[in-house]
Amino acid sequence: MWGGGAGGGSRCIAGADICGDTFSLGQLQDGRFVAALSDGMGHGNQAALESRQAVELLRMCLDAGYDRAQTLTAVNGMMLLAGQGERFTTVDLFLLDLWTGKASLDKLGAAGSYLMQAGRLSPVGGGAPPCRWGYWRTSKAGKS
């Protein structure tokens, strides 16, 4: 079985009391490690609410046994139903199977990520615009 450690943190922009980013790190019952990150575009209460809802929906679906595609489809659908006006958020979903060592990274509207391996930095996915709540049907998850 694979193992490791993870940590995270968030920081408000200067002058703001609330951060619009939310993350969740943990292990699922099926032996996978999950790291979920959402950036509720902007800052303040609305951005924080949107990013928190996205991460909570991801975790609820994964905890219920949904696979990656089902989870992203369900979150996409729930955000479509909840969408009102011009609301944007991004999602990064990293899953590591602690039994096999296989990992996946799915991105919805998120900026590119980087993989450090053997001292080399390689770009991974990204480049799509942020997803608009109520308009996710045209956004597809990029996977790496």
Residue ranges and their predicted role:
Residues 16-31, 91, 123-144:
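Acidic loop->beta-strand submotif enriched in PP2C/PPM serine/threonine phosphatases
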Residues 1-40, 46, 53-56, 114:
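N-terminal entry segment of metal-dependent catalytic domains or homologous docking segments
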